[in-house]
Amino acid sequence: MIYIDNRQNKIKVNEEFENKIKEIIDYALKEEKVNIDYEISVVFIDNNSIKEINKDYRNIDKATDVLSFPMLDYEEGKVFKDVYLNYEFDESDLDEGNLILGDIALSLEKAEEQSKEFGHSFLRETCYLTIHSVLHLLGYDHMEEEEKAIMRQREEEILKSFNLRR
């Protein structure tokens, strides 16, 4: 189950766009071998809102493009398919049968700015940021160069197989 809440009014959002975001989330999760019913919440916000969240949670006083709030714990260097692929979740791990993977806060305003800066479509940028955030929910990180290379490779592989290229 994917919940989308549009809390901004700077970028027009329609049902087709929301469905594309849901589709890319489903696709990325299948590519990462998430084979359990899940729940992810996505909130579309503007630069001011994401700046506040970034300051509150990361002590960084500037707007960013996307923030991820994973609900599962991962050992350093491990991702969902390493830890939970064959894991037997019990009812206490689930909410109405769904594994809560986490929340995504996406600044559509920043995504639009970056799409222009990088010379590709707004849809491609938001799909990329969504995949990036989903991978964070699944334990990927980019703090170390080796982790960053692995994460970037997975992002590009998923985008390419979903037929979205730079």
Curated annotation (Swiss-Prot):
Residues bound to Zn(2+): 132, 136, 142
Keywords, in A-Z order: Cytoplasm, Endonuclease, Hydrolase, Metal-binding, Nuclease, Ribosome biogenesis, rRNA processing, Zinc
Cofactor(s) the protein requires to work: Zn(2+)
Annotated EC: 3.1.-.-
Pfam families to which the protein is assigned, alphabetical: YbeY
Source organism per UniProt: Clostridium botulinum (strain 657 / Type Ba4)
Keyword Metal-binding: yes
Top-level taxon of origin: Bacteria
Recorded name of the encoding gene: ybeY
Compartment(s) where it occurs, according to its Swiss-Prot or TrEMBL record: Cytoplasm
Listed NCBIfam families: rRNA maturation RNase YbeY
Main function: Single strand-specific metallo-endoribonuclease involved in late-stage 70S ribosome quality control and in maturation of the 3' terminus of the 16S rRNA.
Nuclease among keywords: yes
Family: Belongs to the endoribonuclease YbeY family.
Gene Ontology MF, one: metalloendopeptidase activity
Cofactor, how bound (note): Binds 1 zinc ion.
Record-level GO BP terms: rRNA processing
Name this protein carries in UniProt: Endoribonuclease YbeY
GO CC terms in record: cytoplasm
